[in-house]
Amino acid sequence: MSSGKAFIGKPAPDFTATAVMPDGQFKDIKLSDYRGKYVVFFFYPLDFTFVCPTEIIAYSDRADEFKKINCEIIGASVDSHFCHLAWINTPKKQGGLGTMKIPLVSDTKRVIAKDYGVLKEDEGIAYRGLFIIDEKGILRQITINDLPVGRSVDETLRLVQAFQFTDKHGEVCPAGWKPGSDTIKPDVQKSKEYFSKQK
């Protein structure tokens, strides 16, 4: 795995790349075009594989939930945009993706995967990296899974909601926090209000 240029609390590495858009058209997109919104940017190893369609379809199916909280989802792999389109046009019952609500970026030169530190150099594919980027373009969260295990859309949504809550209110979110749950005031005395309610 390459070390990359992606660091928590720093600007996410910008990129320009060709993507297959939800309307099935090819378009060059830039990460910086999404400034003003949160972005969930995730890598997957390859098109026409086994775990990948389950993740991509899961994120696509729930894209509207993310849009409601001002967050866009972008997927990426080292495959060409032509390969992405062929996979989208393959029926789900045959391992395809079907109609997508999210763009799929083509990183054939592996530059983006290297910049984000997810390139599996010996195979030339990306690990399952997931990056949450805030509306200012700052990287807030990084997770990288080994190839055989998929990610949780619920956990991704929870994390975006938690970062947005802390951005807005200045309070911090404890383990397992969900919208509506108690938060902690980041102050030695005021935090006792939260801890006094614990069993």
Swiss-Prot record:
<keyword id="KW-0676">Redox-active center</keyword>
<protein>
    <recommendedName>
        <fullName>Peroxiredoxin-1</fullName>
        <ecNumber>1.11.1.24</ecNumber>
    </recommendedName>
</protein>
<keyword id="KW-0575">Peroxidase</keyword>
<keyword id="KW-1015">Disulfide bond</keyword>
<dbReference type="GO" id="GO:0045454">
    <property type="term" value="P:cell redox homeostasis"/>
</dbReference>
<dbReference type="GO" id="GO:0006979">
    <property type="term" value="P:response to oxidative stress"/>
</dbReference>
<dbReference type="InterPro" id="IPR013766">
    <property type="entry name" value="Thioredoxin_domain"/>
</dbReference>
<comment type="function">
    <text>Thiol-specific peroxidase that catalyzes the reduction of hydrogen peroxide and organic hydroperoxides to water and alcohols, respectively. Plays a role in cell protection against oxidative stress by detoxifying peroxides and as sensor of hydrogen peroxide-mediated signaling events. Might participate in the signaling cascades of growth factors and tumor necrosis factor-alpha by regulating the intracellular concentrations of H(2)O(2). Reduces an intramolecular disulfide bond in GDPD5 that gates the ability to GDPD5 to drive postmitotic motor neuron differentiation.</text>
</comment>
<keyword id="KW-0049">Antioxidant</keyword>
<dbReference type="GO" id="GO:0005829">
    <property type="term" value="C:cytosol"/>
</dbReference>
<feature type="active site" description="Cysteine sulfenic acid (-SOH) intermediate">
    <location>
        <position position="52"/>
    </location>
</feature>
<dbReference type="InterPro" id="IPR050217">
    <property type="entry name" value="Peroxiredoxin"/>
</dbReference>
<dbReference type="GO" id="GO:0019430">
    <property type="term" value="P:removal of superoxide radicals"/>
</dbReference>
<dbReference type="GO" id="GO:0008379">
    <property type="term" value="F:thioredoxin peroxidase activity"/>
</dbReference>
<dbReference type="InterPro" id="IPR000866">
    <property type="entry name" value="AhpC/TSA"/>
</dbReference>
<comment type="subunit">
    <text>Homodimer; disulfide-linked, upon oxidation. 5 homodimers assemble to form a ring-like decamer. Interacts with GDPD5; forms a mixed-disulfide with GDPD5. Interacts with SESN1 and SESN2.</text>
</comment>
<comment type="similarity">
    <text>Belongs to the peroxiredoxin family. AhpC/Prx1 subfamily.</text>
</comment>
<dbReference type="InterPro" id="IPR019479">
    <property type="entry name" value="Peroxiredoxin_C"/>
</dbReference>
<dbReference type="Pfam" id="PF10417">
    <property type="entry name" value="1-cysPrx_C"/>
</dbReference>
<dbReference type="GO" id="GO:0042744">
    <property type="term" value="P:hydrogen peroxide catabolic process"/>
</dbReference>
<dbReference type="GO" id="GO:0045321">
    <property type="term" value="P:leukocyte activation"/>
</dbReference>
<feature type="domain" description="Thioredoxin">
    <location>
        <begin position="6"/>
        <end position="165"/>
    </location>
</feature>
<dbReference type="InterPro" id="IPR024706">
    <property type="entry name" value="Peroxiredoxin_AhpC-typ"/>
</dbReference>
<keyword id="KW-0963">Cytoplasm</keyword>
<dbReference type="InterPro" id="IPR036249">
    <property type="entry name" value="Thioredoxin-like_sf"/>
</dbReference>
<keyword id="KW-0560">Oxidoreductase</keyword>
<dbReference type="Pfam" id="PF00578">
    <property type="entry name" value="AhpC-TSA"/>
</dbReference>
